[in-house]
Every structure is written in C-alpha cells, then in structure tokens.
Amino acid sequence: MAPPAPPPACPLCAAPGAHVLHQSARRRWWLCGGPCGLVYVDPAQRPDAAAERAQYDLHRNDPADAGYVRFLGRLVEPLLAALGPAPRQGLDFGCGPGPTLSGLLAAAGHAVADYDPIYRPDVALLARRYDFVTATEVVEHFHEPAREFARLRGLLRPGGLLALMTKRRAQPERFAGWHYKNDPTHVSFYHTDPLGWIAAGWGATLTLPAPDVALLRLPDSPPAD
C-alpha cells in the first residue's frame, strides 16, 4: 500500500505540516502548521475557472443595491479616515461585475480605477502604483495567496494602504458550523494571525477597525537592506 500523501504546503507561508481542521463529504480544510495560521481548502478540491465564473455570475451587487452600499460602508468609513485629505489615487482590485466601491470613494473626492480578472481585466492597471488598493470579498478566493498578496503589495506606493474586507475565520471549535466556508469559491480563510503575518513581512502596520475589515499601511520608505 502506498503511503498517504503529505499534507499540502501552506499557500501563504509555504510551511509544511498542516493538519486537517475540518472535513466534509466534498472538501477538506487544512490549518497551516507554520507561522501564519491560514486555513485553506485542499488544492485538489478548489473550483476551476469555469465553476468560479458561474458562481460569480449569480452575484447581483451593484450601486443601486442599498443593502450592498451599506455593507461596503463598513470599509468606506475607516478607509476614508485613514486616507486623509482627497484626492488620492486608488485601485479597486476585484471590483466584480457591478463596480460600486469606486463610486462611493469618488464621491469623497478620490480617483479610483476598477480592476477585475474576469469582468474588467485591464492589466495595464496592474503596471501602476497607487496610494491605496481595496479588495472587498476578494482574498478568500485566492488559490495562491502568497502570489496574490505580493501582487497587491507591488501595487502600493510607499506609505500606501491596503484595505481588505473578508470575514475573519471562526475559531477551530466553531469552524464546522461556519457558513462562510460553504461558498465553493471561498478557499482561503484569515484571522488576526495570517493578517499579522502578512503585515510583519511587509513592515506594515495592521489595524482592524471592524470584524471583517483590515487596513495594512506600508512604511513611508522601503526598509533598508
């Protein structure tokens, strides 16, 4: 009999030694055995691009949806306070089919471009740098969070701000009943440890102004070698 395959390395910090946090009939969720504490779906059980697109096409988030606008307000208010005087230049990364956040920030005097790998795939926007980048309900979809967070880091100017919105992962004893894990496109789950690990690696400061909002601010100048 062949020996069991080793646990998949953490897709954020690359640590080995993960253990199964929860398992259902269709999915297995691993808890990182290293320093970052990410929870992630088994790579073999992630949805493919077509399945992801089919799920995203079901979303009906747009500027005319008052409930969605209120939802985004949980990020908009602390972000505007952190940005200071307008205008600042920003990018909404993963804006979806109905960009909304950029309009809310534009109303406060900021210039925000919309990028989405499916619905607005203008890769020229990824060659620029910004005062701030937003990613609302995005990072939980990352199959390769190390690569994607490096991309987000590279979009920011010195002193820039990354504003994230994602539900923070339930405690292990409550994970089995946590609804957020059930979306088939949600494959990476964060709480304060993974977010703190990312911030430390960037030399950034981390603030958590709401239960599902995180702000990471880069230093004003790159750290010396």
Task: Identify what each model region corresponds to.
Residues 137, 141:
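A short His-aromatic
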